[in-house]
Amino acid sequence: MADWVREADEPISSDKVTSTIPIPARVRWYWPSRDRVLSLGAALLLSLPTAVYFWFYEGHASNQLFVWSVTLAFGAWLVLAFRRVLVASVLVNSLLGIVATMSWAKQQAMDMALHAYDLMFYLRSWGTIAFLWNGFRIHILALAAALLATAIAAVLAYRYDATRVNRRSALFAILMLTLAASVAAELKAERRHTQYYWDDLHISSFYSSWAETFEMLWRGQLIEAAASAPGPLFAIPSACETSTKPPHIILIHEESIVPPGYFPTLQYDHGIDRFFVSHDGKMHRLQVETYGGASWITEFSVMTGVSTQSFGGMRQFVQSLMAGKLHDTLPEALTRCGYRNVVFYPLERNFVSYDRFYASVGLKEVFDEKDQAAPTDNERDSFYFGNALDEIARHLRKSNKPLFTYILTMATHSPYDFTYMPEVDVPGGGPGTDPEMSEYLRRLAMAKIDYDELRHELARRFPTERFLIVHYGDHHPIATRTLLGFSTQLEAEDVSLPLDSLGFTTYYAVDGVNYRPPPQPEIETLDVPFLPVVILNAARLPLSDAFRERERLLAACKGRYFTCAPRDAILAFHRRLINSGLIDAH
């Protein structure tokens, strides 16, 4: 055993020397004492459960390298502080066990793994501490007991640990392991947008979250914003005055839908193209901020009028992060104008914390898959439309209020490696079309049929009611990856695209039944955070101060939000939202 497991200046007793050959004073290699062997053995034994956990639960090779490098670097810092291997092992393994358990418990309660920002958010005020105490008292007591047990174990280990590590050796280990962790972080690439929700990579997710937490602390708030901004504070009107009863609004979140006409080489039935055309006879391009999945990223911007890109590394779970921190949202604006808001959601309401987010932005009534008695979580669009039509009928029998109905579809969701509803005879792709794309086109044809039927039923069942219908594609289907130049072997999370890529361009359409919407903005592409102001204008509803500023920015930035030139205009807008209390940015 080498010099790093003993005091650097510890003398060598004569009984340890078995040779008559003189040993230089700086070369002091010898077998460690029994106490040191026991201390090292105990340290390794404590690390065995952690090693097994990492092997089975922390992902692929590059992720393993990352989590091991960070863990060992943390241990090296503790060795630098205490000079004792067993103490470092006790603290590292105990704290990892606590973090993994806390992350699991949080995921059970909120459908999201532990993030470094949680430590700052929940411990920053007595109000959040009281929330935890009232709602999760048993968990808090268990955490306190675990921390106390860890402290006692560390004190005992410090008392009996016979190892002594040279601090220069510990510092060298820190440098090497930090370098290894940096390389591993690059190798494992960008974090997948589903990682915090259901990948169960509790430790590596927690480690990764520190970088964006430090970024947020450096920035001073969760969202990018100017240090100061001219202009008055945004006020929220207490009422909404309209000269006539506004139209009912149906907003359809079209899952994984993009116009196939964006790809000139694609052969398909061009009768589908009419699906994407608005009342003005034009197709309008929508720029979203996610590819192939993570619908909640698009939905966040549609409901709040803010870009997820402005949250930096926090963007992938911004729904959970910002629940209760945003005001004057699209649903709240509609509520002020007398609307009743309802949602038809195809999954369970607590999926990726949707229920908390919906409630926080003003969507109080949610019909999830259980409420709708859905046989599966990817029913044909006509199933959700039928439920919505029935609810509209019930509402009109009881109330004269306008109704905002938000419908999320699922039939066009991946995977596309099986034939969805094979009994339905609709065209797919032409000869030579990739099989996944051909299946996607079949489902798109069904989506158009179901949408046309929805319009027909609205006109037939409610001939005296006016309806504004807005539908939009939330992101590309993974089936477009080959058309964008990527391999069929790549999953959605592995497709890396620049912000101006066609892979982020979908569509939005504005339509009406017994109602003619006003003209749409004359711009080439609309960024998704501007869609809520387009909806309010299409319904001819008065705008609050913040939405009037969005309308001005839409024109000034030519429909671009995060990439607006000048960028300072958006950052100043964010500062005014913060100063006005419409965004809690901490």
Question: Positions of the model-derived regions?
Answer:
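Transmembrane and membrane-interface helices of multi-pass
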Residues: 2-201
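Solvent-exposed soluble domains appended to multi-pass membrane proteins
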Residues: 237-240, 251-254, 259-586
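Membrane-interface micro-motifs in multi-pass membrane enzymes
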Residues: 64, 201-209, 292-293, 324, ...
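Membrane-interface transmembrane-helix boundary segments in multi-pass integral membrane proteins
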Residues: 127-144, 208-218, 436-443
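Short hydrophobic/aromatic-rich motifs at helix boundaries and adjacent loops
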Residues: 46-49, 94-99, 124-125, 247, ...
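Membrane-interface segments at or immediately adjacent to transmembrane helices
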Residues: 182-253, 262-265
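A diffuse structural propensity rather than consistent per-protein peaks
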Residues: 108-116, 203, 368, 487, ...
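Generic structural signal for short, solvent-exposed loop/turn connectors between secondary structure elements
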Residues: 39-41, 55-69, 80-88, 229-247, ...
